[in-house]
Amino acid sequence: MNKLISFFILVTFSYSSCETTKNIFGNKAKETTVEELNTKVLEKTIIYKTFSGKANIDITGPNISQSVNAQIDILKDSVIGISLRVLGIEGARVMITPDSIKILDRLNQQYIPRSFSFIETNFSLPITFSDLENLICGNPVFYNNTTLSQGISDDKYVLFAQKDVYKNTIWLSADLDILRMFIEDLMNKRTLTLTYDEFDKIEGRQFAFLRTILIDATDDFTANIAFSKITFNQPFEFTFNVNPKYERID
């Protein structure tokens, strides 16, 4: 369960709904400048105060083949709360803040507090709390508005951007919805591929409901995640109470 939790924290954030309809992109990409495309990408950024959603997640990798259900709640810039269930029973609860990650492993009756640097230490990935929020909402990650170049391929816009040692190739539909991101770690020779499908509008926001995550590194992982019952800007309740009988793992 601990290995599953660690992997889930890293790649948990993609969506699908059993009630959505697939968006067929009818428009064609038109010639534009890098500056115009950057501006349009920023205009498509999802703005919110709270997010809530349920997910069905299938994860495969070395020594992992697991399906879980998850409830994910976000209070923007403050906390990400995650409840993981297997066969209807909560196996773990995770609370992430900008400076900490706290895990309740109910199956092993353990409390595992960590600093936010746990992610970088274990995965050599300098991801921020804001990056995690962007992953959940489908906003660009490892993208600091510094686009090296852009082009058009098969009626899709292609952006080439770089942030530190991370090179990000982003494919956009003619409607400027993110279809795929291919992130290369130029120093450690690792890649992260995010694909997006099943677009629909949720409360006026164009949203990719089906995503696949591929990590190509020392260990290779795949995650297929199906999200449903998504809401924005609605109150939610997320509790994180540590049972005094749980073993603390420092």
Regions found by a protein language model. Give the residues of each.
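Sec-dependent bacterial lipoprotein signal peptides
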Residues: M1-C18
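N-terminal leader/targeting segments and the immediate start of mature chains
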Residues: C18-Q66, R248-D250
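Gly/Pro-enriched, hydrophobic low-complexity segments
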Residues: T20, S149-D250
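One face of beta-strands
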Residues: K49-I57, Q66-I74, S78-L84, A92-V94, ...
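Hydrophobic lipid-interacting interfaces of membrane-associated proteins
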Residues: D58-T60, L87-I89, K201
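Short, surface-exposed charged micro-motifs
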Residues: Q71-I72, G91-R93, T169-W171, E198
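An acidic-aromatic
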Residues: I80-S130
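C-terminal low-complexity, charged extensions that often adopt amphipathic alpha-helices
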Residues: N122-G151
